[in-house]
């Protein structure tokens, strides 16, 4: 039996945490009889370790440092943390959200024999960076998409205790979901600030105004984080253009919701559409989850979400690629990289049209639901996992086996 260690932020409330749990689930389901699978539970920034994991998974968790050399080591993290500690090393990463990554990341992914990415966009970023920096990718680069849990994210399971939404007086609300990350107004990666600005600018002073439900946080769900988010909302609303006029209501949802509660939020009758101006996604899980509702999705057709969205069925926000602003740059989002900047005038026209002529957008929302149900459930992505396991088996056959001397 091969000794396998999977290092990931498995217990965290993060995008990488969700992706890790999908990978681990499929590995255990397929290989538990052949592999002795252990888990390393790693942090992910300041995100909380609050995701409930099963007792079986808890029993598999081992402490650092590892006291043995694994036959297979699987790391679900950013490329700079990849380590070749086993006979077969597999990396899983969403890479960066810019159109290029640091050139040294090509050396990082080459430490592994296999690297799994969640979208064609991420793969293309690695390939384009390798080409522009005259480097060769030596690892096997495989796209295995993320998926949604069809037993949770469904209109048939739209119950759940979200009584707090009863406090919302408006019967029509746009929903936006995403962490509020570093960057000036209009420059944070999820573009939460741009969502607020464009929504308020669209409906300010109108006789009839919808609401915006904002499910966001910084890195934690602490009181201090909530206060910071409220302050950042205030900074957006403090623009001179919004002075001395009535503004639409914004309702902040700040806290840890279960998958069932998120599904209830998506399907709540007051939530009529999702609105996102994201600049870039490695994948874009909340967009996929919301697509299961059959409601309109107002979003750019760019980066990782292109894999699971259909351009004909979304309410597409137009825009262009622009350099990443210095206020949003870091070791992953580098100077010289570009990402999407929306045409705010176009986005505001779409918001107004969806609000005024909502019935015109319902059919395409239902078509998008059919599209994701057909292609991005757990069962639908299994052929991609088949491809991955075929590659793993090929490499696995080359691992030296210990034999007993007679």
Residues covered by each model-derived region:
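Acidic donor-binding loop of glycosyltransferase active sites
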Residues: 264-282, 292-295
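Extended catalytic core of nucleotide-activated donor transferases of GT-like folds
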Residues: 5-7, 44-129
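Conserved catalytic-core segment of nucleotide-activated headgroup transferases in glycan assembly
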Residues: 19-21, 26, 150-261
């Amino acid at each position: 039996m091969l000794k396998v260690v999977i290092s990931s932020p498995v217990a965290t409330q993060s995008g990488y945490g969700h992706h890790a749990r999908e990978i681990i689930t499929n590995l255990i389901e397929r290989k538990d009889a052949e592999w002795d699978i252990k888990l390393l539970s790693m942090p992910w920034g300041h995100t909380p370790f609050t995701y409930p994991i099963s007792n079986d998974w808890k029993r598999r968790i081992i402490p650092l440092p590892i006291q043995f050399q694994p036959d297979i080591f699987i790391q679900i993290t950013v490329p700079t943390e990849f380590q070749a500690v086993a006979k077969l090393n597999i990396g899983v990463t969403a890479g960066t959200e810019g159109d290029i990554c640091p050139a040294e990341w090509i050396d990082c992914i080459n430490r592994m024999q296999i690297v799994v990415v969640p979208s064609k966009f991420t793969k293309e970023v690695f390939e384009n960076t390798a080409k522009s920096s005259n480097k060769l990718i030596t690892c096997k680069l495989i796209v295995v998409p993320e998926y949604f849990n069809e037993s949770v994210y469904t209109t048939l399971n739209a119950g759940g205790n979200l009584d707090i939404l009863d406090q919302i007086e408006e019967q029509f609300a746009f929903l936006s979901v995403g962490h509020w990350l570093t960057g000036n107004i209009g420059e944070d990666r999820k573009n939460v600030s741009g969502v607020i600005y464009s929504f308020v600018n669209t409906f300010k002073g109108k006789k009839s105004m919808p609401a915006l439900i904002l499910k966001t946080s910084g890195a934690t769900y602490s009181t201090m984080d909530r206060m910071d988010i409220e302050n950042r909302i205030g900074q957006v609303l403090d623009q001179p253009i919004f002075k001395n006029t009535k503004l639409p209501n914004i309702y902040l949802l700040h806290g840890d919701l279960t998958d069932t509660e998120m599904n209830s939020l998506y399907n709540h009758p007051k939530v009529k559409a999702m609105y996102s101006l994201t600049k870039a996604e490695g994948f874009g899980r909340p967009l996929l989850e919301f697509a299961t509702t059959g409601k309109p999705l107002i979003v750019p057709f760019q980066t990782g979400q292109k894999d699971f969205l259909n351009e004909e069925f979304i309410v597409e926000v137009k825009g262009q690629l622009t350099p990443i602003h210095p206020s949003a740059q870091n070791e992953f989002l580098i100077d010289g990289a570009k990402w999407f900047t929306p045409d705010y005038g176009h986005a505001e026209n779409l918001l107004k049209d969806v609000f005024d002529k909502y019935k015109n957008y319902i059919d395409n929302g239902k078509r998008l639901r059919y599209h994701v149900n057909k292609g991005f459930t757990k069962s639908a992505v299994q052929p991609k996992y088949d491809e991955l396991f075929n590659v793993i088996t090929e490499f696995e056959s080359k691992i030296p086996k210990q034999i007993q001397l007679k």
